Structure formats: structure tokens, C-alpha cells
UniProtKB/Swiss-Prot annotation:
Effect the entry attributes to changing C42A: Reduces hydrolysis of inosine, adenosine, and guanosine by a factor of about 14-, 22-, and 10-fold, respectively
Active site: residue positions: D13 (proton acceptor)
Cofactor names: Ca(2+)
Residues that hold Ca(2+) according to the record: D13, D18, I133, D254
EC number: 3.2.2.-, 3.2.2.1, 3.2.2.2, 3.2.2.3
Family classification: Belongs to the IUNH family.
UniProt keyword annotation of Hydrolase present: yes
Swiss-Prot/TrEMBL GO biological process terms: purine nucleoside catabolic process
Catalysed reactions, semicolon-separated: a purine D-ribonucleoside + H2O = a purine nucleobase + D-ribose; guanosine + H2O = D-ribose + guanine; xanthosine + H2O = D-ribose + xanthine; adenosine + H2O = D-ribose + adenine
Enzyme class of the recorded protein, top EC level: hydrolase
Disulfide links within the chain: none
UniProt cross-references to PANTHER family, sorted A to Z: SI:CH211-201H21.5, SI:CH211-201H21.5-RELATED
Protein name per the record: Nucleoside hydrolase
Annotated source species: Caenorhabditis elegans
């Protein structure tokens, strides 16, 4: 039976939940990966590039280009550097000698900056979905370089942001990590992209975490003994130990955004359209998504029935069991994604 493919370009900072999400995309029969782009985030952009290329090999794939992008945020400001406690120094378990062994060439991207690659690839593939699972710097730079880029993706799926001010950044911030990593980039993207945008926010995981912890074994898919299962077990090992020490599991996050990009109708159980912006000035709220709940905050004085900001779709509940089934299919090699 012929499967209708969903073309994807995935922009990532390449840490443990990213590589599990990337593996899901590489294994899913409905996903066609055009390229990966690496961005700074929980690790350096060089390390992100290396982790993505290593993950491609772990999935027994080749010939998928990886482009290296922004090494710093738009303003090059300091950010939370405590995430190595959760992901490891290299972001995926700190065992570079394990399969697949890190190669020196892993730290080298294709001969083009990621933002330029995004412009070129999506200009030629207007039916492709752009998925971002790291800070939005590469996408913002693409918009700064090419205004028409705002219309190139068929849609943009973002893992990041929040809508009830629930943050996950150390230091008392009310921002989500990816948006906190480059608030200016997040603001540029939400204001200027013209294609449909779907955001999978931090609260989607936070509010349902206890229910999901009780119904899903988030480590079971890592125990098949296959090369991919072993690699992802290694990549998530530090985070799983940290979570277990706090009485919880290392559940899915970036994986939900990639799954949503592959089949939004199947994964997104509930969603809400909201007028939003990103706070750029607050000492505790910088990077937080601000929601116009009354739909009056950014009303257009010259056209009262119009809005100066656009509505963005937020996934507020998702089918974790389908994502878990897909990851079992990926790591076991069963191919049973249906």
C-alpha cells in the first residue's frame, strides 16, 4: 500500500529528547526527511551537529544533509547553562566511544549555513513542514535574510513556549527553555511567519505528566536490545536517572512535536487558537509567551475588528499512547506504526 509522505525539515539542538524525536521521524514510514539543521541550545551548535549525524547512523540511514547554523542567540546573551546536569556534557549520555562511535567529521555540517539552507530547501519544497525542537535562531535569521521565507513552509510546528506562564528554566524564570534560549528569535518567528503555526508548549507535558506517568512505561521501548534501542537508552540515561531520583519518568517532549508534524490529526487531541507575543524585557518573564486572553490587547485602533497579531494553534492535549507505540515500532524494528 502506498503511504502518503509528509516532507519534514527538522531544526534541532541535538540533545537526548531531540535524538529520540529524530529517530522517530527517521523510522516512521510516513515521514520523508529532507534535511536537518543544527542550532545552539542545550549544547553548542557543533555538538548538536555531531549528535544529529551520529543519530542518523544509529538509525542506519545516510545521505540526509545536516546544516550547521547559529552558534549564539540573536543578542548573544548568556543563558541557562545547568542543563548538562540533565543531558550530560555532550547532551546524549557522554559516551562517545559507544555505538555509533563519534567521528571527527560529525562536527562538520554541509557547506552552507543552516538559515540559508532553510530558505533554499523550503523554497523548492513548498509542501514541506518545518519542525523546530530547539531555540528559533536559525528560523529568525532566515526571516531576516529573506522576507518571502515566511510563506515557504506549508506549516511550522514548534516545540517551545508556554501559555499559562509555566516555565522550566532554572533561576526562577517563567519561560520555557527553547524560547528563553532566544526570546528575540521567538518573537520574530511568531510575528512574521505567515504559514500556519502549531505550537506544542511546555504545559502540554506539565499538566498531564502525572496521568501519563501512571499509564505509560517510558523506558520500555529502550529495552529491545536492538542497536537503535541501545543507542537511545544511552542517550537518555542521565536524564532518566535524574527523573527517577525525583520519583518520575523521563517522558516525551520533542517527540510529541515531531509526531504532531507527522500526523497532527492523530496526535493532537485538543488544541486552542491564541493571540500571542513573547516578553522581551521582564527580569523573571523574559522569553515567556504572553497571551491576549481577551483579544483586546493588540487590537488595531485603525481597524477595530482586526488584530495586529496573528492567532497561533497551541496543542493542549495529545495522544501519548500513539507516540509510545510509534517509538516501540521504531526501536524494536517491528515497523508496526499503524
Amino acid at each position: 500500500m502506498t503511504v502518503d509522505k509528509v516532507k519534514l525539515v527538522i531544526d534541532s539542538d541535538g540533545v537526548s529528547d531531540d535524538v529520540r524525536a529524530i529517530s522517530l521521524a527517521l523510522q516512521h514510514p510516513k515521514a520523508e526527511i529532507l534535511a536537518f539543521t543544527a542550532v545552539h541550545g542545550c549544547v553548542t551548535v557543533d555538538q548538536a551537529c555531531a549528535n544529529i549525524k551520529r543519530t542518523i547512523r544509529a538509525n542506519d540511514r545516510s545521505n540526509i544533509p545536516v546544516y550547521k547554523g547559529a552558534a549564539k542567540s540573536i543578542l548573544s546573551l548568556p543563558k541557562d547553562d545547568t542543563v548538562s546536569d540533565f543531558f550530560g556534557i555532550d547532551g546524549i549520555g557522554d559516551k562517545p566511544e559507544e555505538f555509533p562511535k563519534v567521528e571527527r567529521s560529525d562536527f562538520e555540517g554541509e557547506g552552507k549555513h543552516a538559515s540559508l539552507a532553510l530558505i533554499d530547501i523550503l523554497r523548492e519544497n513548498r509542501d514541506a513542514t518545518l519542525v523546530t525542537i530547539g531555540p528559533l535562531t536559525n528560523v529568525a535569521i532566515a526571516l531576516q535574510l529573506c522576507e518571502e521565507f515566511s510563506t515557504y513552509p506549508s506549516r511550522l510546528v514548534i516545540m517551545g513556549g508556554n501559555y499559562y506562564a509555566v516555565g522550566n528554566v532554572d533561576g526562577g524564570s517563567s519561560a520555557e527553555y527553547n524560547f528563553h534560549g532566544d526570546p528575540e528569535a521567538a518573537s520574530i518567528v511568531l510575528r512574521r511567519m505567515k504559514c500556519p503555526i502549531t505550537i506544542v508548549p511546555w504545559e502540554a507535558f506539565y499538566f498531564e505528566s502525572k496521568t501519563h506517568d501512571a499509564s505509560v512505561d517510558f523506558s520500555a521501548h529502550l529495552k529491545y536490545g536492538t542497536p537503535l534501542a541501545n543507542y537511545l537508552s544511552l542517550a537518555t540515561s542521565i536524564g532518566r536517572v535524574k527523573c527517577e531520583a525525583n520519583g518520575r519518568q523521563y517522558s516525551y517532549c520533542d517527540e510529541i512535536a515531531v509526531a504532531t508534524a507527522i500526523d497532527e490529526d492523530k496526535i493532537a487531541k485538543k488544541s486552542q487558537y491564541l493571540y500571542v507575543d513573547v516578553e522581551l524585557n521582564g527580569t523573571k518573564t523574559r522569553g515567556q509567551v504572553v497571551v491576549d486572553w481577551t483579544e483586546q490587547l493588540w487590537s488595531n485602533e485603525e481597524a477595530p475588528n482586526q488584530h495586529t497579531h496573528r492567532r497561533v494553534k497551541f496543542v493542549t492535549s495529545y495522544d501519548v499512547h500513539t507516540v509510545d507505540k510509534w517509538l516501540h515500532a521504531a526501536t524494536s524494528g517491528s515497523g508496526k506504526f499503524d
